[in-house]
A protein has these predicted regions:
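Conserved hydrophobic/aromatic beta-strand scaffold that supports enzyme active sites
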Residues: 32, 42, 104-108, 126
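Conserved Nudix-box catalytic region and its N-terminal flanking loop in Nudix hydrolases
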Residues: 39-78
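Active-site-adjacent beta-strand/loop module that shapes the phosphate/pyrophosphate-binding cleft
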Residues: 83, 92-116, 123
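Short secondary-structure junctions
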Residues: 79-86
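NUDIX/MutT-family hydrolases
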Residues: 108, 116-151
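Conserved N-terminal beta-strand and adjoining loop/helix that marks the start
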Residues: 8-40, 61, 92
Length: 162
């Protein structure tokens, strides 16, 4: 996997950072599920979580002793009820959110089994560029840009705002 840059994307720079400048990075496994028609899955952040209602790619924290792939497999069963096939590590992006500094390990997934079931009360949407759902989580934006590059898409990848 290649990193976009060593410097993290800063989300909401006007807000104070919890934990200060020396806070630990949280390792996160993120699944970019892609259908044969090229549509990709976005889910909304569930009620009660930071950035509630924002749209993102599904995934979650890597637990101690887990690999990114193991965490992704576990998280996608827990969150959306699917068992995934091959995991294709794609890109890494660091994002400095006010509540956490995260290292997002994006993995493409083309095969899965089971019906989508949102176990945390979130919504889901199969999207193409430009995505229609909003608001989009800041850590999701680089992925939309990468898709635009891969797919030779010109124009805005999303619309921000509620």
């Amino acid at each position: 996997m290649s990193a976009r840059s060593a410097k993290p994307l800063v989300a909401h720079p006007d807000r104070p950072r919890q934990g200060g400048p020396d806070r630990a990075e949280v390792e996160v496994a993120v699944g970019v599920l892609i259908r044969p028609d090229g549509a990709f899955l976005l889910t909304s952040r569930p009620p009660g979580k930071v950035y509630e209602g924002y749209w993102e790619f599904p995934g979650g924290k890597v637990e101690p002793g887990e690999s990114v792939e193991q965490a992704l497999r576990r998280e996608l069963v827990e969150e959306i009820g699917v068992v995934i096939g091959a995991v294709h590590p794609w890109r890494v992006e660091r994002v400095d959110y006010p509540h956490a500094l995260v290292r997002l390990n994006f993995c493409k997934v083309f095969e899965w089994s089971g019906e989508l079931h949102m176990h945390e009360g979130q919504s889901f949407a199969w999207e193409m560029l430009p995505v229609q759902v909003r608001p989009v989580l800041p850590g999701t934006v680089p992925v939309l840009d990468w898709f635009a590059q891969e797919r030779s898409f010109e124009g805005p990848t999303h619309t921000q705002g509620a």
